[in-house]
Amino acid sequence: IPKIENIRPQMKRIEIGADLNGSELAQVTRVLTTTSEVERFFEDLADSEIELLRLYQWQKQLVNLPELTRQLKTAIDEDGRVTDDASPELRTIRNNIRRSEQTIREQLDGLIRGGNAKYLSDTIVTMRNDRYVIPVKQEYRGVFGGVVHDQSASGQTLFIEPKQIVDSNNRLRSHQIAERSEIERILAELSAALVPHRRDILHNATVIGHLDFINGKA
């Protein structure tokens, strides 16, 4: 039986209308998944005509929630990240983000190659303030135009967002804001789906804990 976390605080929070984050939902998902696995294990024992009456008394208390389990496993991965499969809208937004990032990198790669290399401290693309920038030598700050987002400790390098990519960076930022909003909506929806089942889920966690304890003593 896998070790599961204490989910009592999470169940308390959804009871008062709070939303769980991805990591917290992943913890609840582990309880539900383990419930399903324990149920299958006991079904296999029954098929084998093996009787463990003491354990069956605990198993009978489990409430399997297959549809809720499937919904959570589809939307939240084991690390608590909201997956692309969580909603068609999120998949579309993330595809837009990937395309925007690819476009920006291609634009910047074109800028830092060839003759422009002499204006740069290094021919790399990096990030400042969630914007793609390039490291430009202080004395050439006017070559690329655009926005200065940061400078090196020595002041010899400026991290500049060239004017050619400002619009692309703005589009990317817009997609990222949309992604965050959709993730918040999904987390709220999943948290709300748990509310009617919170007592069953909490009791399942207690039963699994007892079974794990008994297994440890065996």
Task: Identify what each model region corresponds to.
Residues E24, V82, A86-E89, I93, ...:
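Surface positions of alpha-helical coiled-coils, especially the charged/polar e/g heptad sites
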Residues N64-D77, D167-A188:
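Extended, charged coiled-coil "arm/hinge" scaffolds of SMC/Rad50-like chromosome-maintenance ATPases
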Residues D79, A86-S100, S168, H175, ...:
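Long, non-membrane, amphipathic alpha-helices that form coiled-coils
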Residues I124, R128-P162, N169:
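SMC-family hinge/dimerization module
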Residues I1-E89, I93, H197-D200, N204-A218:
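Conserved amphipathic alpha-helical "coupling/scaffold" segments
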Residues I177-H210:
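Non-transmembrane, heptad-repeat alpha-helical coiled-coil rod segments
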Residues R91-Y140:
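Extended, Lys/Arg-enriched charged tracts that mediate electrostatic binding to polyanionic substrates
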Residues E43, L108, I112-G115, I183, ...:
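Coiled-coil heptad-register positions
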